[in-house]
Regions:
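Sec-dependent N-terminal signal peptides
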Residues: 4-14
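Extracytoplasmic copper-binding redox domains, predominantly the cupredoxin/blue-copper superfamily
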Residues: 18-140
Length: 140
C-alpha cells in the first residue's frame, strides 16, 4: 500500500510542477518594467531580465513581510518563485521614487492590499501604485 501512495504523491507533485509557468519581465529603457502588473498562480516563477542597465528588483511589501525575496543586484538576471498568495509590490532601487514599480498578484488574492497601499512612497511612486492597483482590480 505504501508504494502506491508514494507513486501517487509523486504523480500529483509532478503534475503541479508541470503546470507552473514562468513569466519574463524586462527592465526597459524608459525606466519601467515591461510587465507592470503580473497576475500569476502559486508556484509560478517570474524572471526579470536585464535588457537595460542600471535597474534591479527590490520588494517593498507582500503577504509576509518577513519572507520577502532579497533585493537583486543591479544589471542582473533575477528569478523568484511565488508560493504565497497575495499582493507583492516591488521597485527598482535607483528609480523607485520616479515610479519604476511593479505589482505581482498571486492567486488573484488581494487580502493584503491595504498593507501595500500603506507603504510609504514618493508622491510620483504613490500615483503609479494607484494606477497599477486599478489595472490589477480591473483584470480580477
Amino acid at each position: 500500500m505504501r508504494p502506491i501512495i508514494f507513486v501517487l504523491s509523486l504523480i500529483i507533485m509532478s503534475s503541479k510542477l508541470a503546470s507552473a509557468e514562468t513569466i519574463q519581465i524586462d527592465f526597459t529603457s524608459d525606466d519601467s518594467y515591461s510587465v507592470e502588473v503580473a497576475k500569476i498562480d502559486v508556484g509560478d516563477t517570474i524572471d526579470w531580465l536585464p535588457k537595460n542597465e542600471g535597474h534591479n528588483v527590490e520588494f517593498l511589501g507582500g503577504p509576509d513581510f518577513n519572507s520577502l525575496p532579497e533585493r537583486s543586484d543591479l544589471n542582473a538576471f533575477y528569478s523568484v518563485t511565488f508560493n504565497l498568495t497575495g499582493v507583492y509590490l516591488y521597485h527598482c532601487t535607483p528609480h523607485g521614487n520616479m515610479g519604476m514599480l511593479g505589482l505581482v498578484i498571486v492567486g488573484n488574492d488581494f487580502h493584503n492590499l491595504k498593507d501595500i497601499e500603506g507603504i510609504e512612497l514618493s508622491r510620483v511612486a504613490k500615483s503609479v501604485l494607484k494606477r497599477l492597483i486599478r489595472i490589477a482590480k480591473s483584470n480580477s
